[in-house]
Amino acid sequence: MAADSGRCGAGQLVDKYGSALFRFCLVMLRNAADAEDAVQETLLRYIERSPEFESAGAERAWLFTVAANRCRDTLRAASRHPQLTLDELAGLGAEKSELGILDALMNLPEKYRLALTLHYVEGYSTGEIASMLGRTPSAIKMRLKKGRELLGKEIFDGE
């Protein structure tokens, strides 16, 4: 069945992964239009290559790795790094209580923001994140620890 997932239609692919990839790219890029572009490029690469995977987890990891690389390319090419406003986040359907957390998360350095998003939002283990980012699991654990500390300071200092 996993091999069939590499051959699913574009609509099925978007339904299955589109929203999670968009949230991930939005956190990395801080710009909805750039996030949409990164998701489209990621899905296009998937469709062009038609990779086969042994499991849905491997497929998902491949997509998020490609999306992360696309986001990094966008950040390298950009001369500025716009940040989402609270109004833009509210327009994406976030609850008011989530806005403070999302705003604080957006203010963190990329390496912490990325680790926290992959672990707590997307549900990846430290080992999976380490593999995606080319780091050791212990380095990811340290990023998560430091990221939580920074996020707490961001949230409570902002009150």
Summary of predicted features, one role per range:
Residues R23, D37-L44, G57-N69:
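Structural recognition of an alpha-helix C-terminal capping motif at a helix-to-coil junction
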Residues A68, R72, L133-G158:
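DNA-recognition helix of helix-turn-helix
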Residues D73, R80-L105, S125:
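Internal acidic/polar
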Residues A115-H119:
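A short pre-motif secondary-structure segment
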Residues M1-R23, E36:
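A short, charge-rich alpha-helical start-of-domain segment used by transcription regulators
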Residues E48, E54, F64-L84, K146:
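Arg/Lys-rich amphipathic alpha helix in sigma70-family domain 2
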Residues A2-D4, R30, E41-A58, A77-S79, ...:
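Sigma70-family region 2
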Residues F22, L43, P109, R113, ...:
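C-terminal flanking helix
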